[in-house]
């Protein structure tokens, strides 16, 4: 019982701290800094530094879900989708959930787009234990 109470308090405190963290992104400057400095600035400082950092309005997990859905729906299956799939996994979207999300998207955005997304998602979630979600594994580690 004490472990459960301690875990609950820790989770609440951690979520409050996480909600206040500013997302730091340098991919724009790293990849496009001298070629397209304004775009790099907007990517790093506005999109990630401001929009993604408004976690008090919409959490990172939900932002990841919206972003993945948008990219797949547009047929974007390049390194940007891989990056956002990796972020989604870090933000708590499980292997089971991503499979269901992509399946659902397939009916609305197109079957070939879902196939392409599955090929990338399999790589991101390849090391997950078969039949287990990241949440379950994380919860087991915390006990």
Which residue ranges define each predicted feature?
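Short helix-coil transition sites and intra-membrane helix breaks within transmembrane domains
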Residues: 74-79, 110-113
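Positively charged n-region of N-terminal signal peptides that target proteins for export
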Residues: 1-4
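A cross-kingdom feature marking solvent-exposed beta-strand/loop segments within repeated
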Residues: 79-103
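C-terminal binding/interaction regions
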Residues: 104-105, 109, 117
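Acidic, glycine/proline-rich low-complexity segments that act as flexible tails and inter-domain linkers
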Residues: 20-62, 82, 90, 114-143
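Short, structured motif recognition centered on aromatic/hydrophobic residues
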Residues: 62-72, 81, 98-102
